[in-house]
Amino acid sequence: MQHAYDVTNEFAEVAKTAKLKGLEGLESISMKTGIPIQMMLALKCDTIEEAFETVGKPAAIEFKYDGFRIQAHKDGKNNIILFTRRLEDVTNQFPDLADFVLKNVKGRSFILDAEAVGYDKKTGKYLPFQSISQRIKRKYGIEKMSEEMPVEVNVFD
């Protein structure tokens, strides 16, 4: 049941499927482009020792970017939809990011899990999350903001 909810975010659909088709029906529910899915979040540990106790050895360790989590969905018709960790559609606020994904990621239909990070065009250095968060809620002046505060996308495996 949890898996069905994670890939639909629709309690009503999960309940209806469970009632009509039972466990077999729930197991048949799968991800669909355009419908955001719950994102897997990193486990927090106080020490490296605690981290290894939690996940075991060997373990893959990735750099922590100070950006925001993004899901990029491509629907098979060259439409890109971007969702935040809270499952909000932010495609309009990040046309540059949507365009980048469309031009650089091959595939007819997909869902990518990534971190979008703002950077300073002059220095190439990453900007803190607080800077890029201005773009998330932006409704006007998006083109100018895209020029002043570009973002790059770091895709998770």
Where are these regions (language model features)?
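N-terminal nucleic-acid-engaging modules of covalent nucleotidyltransferase systems
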Residues: 1-156
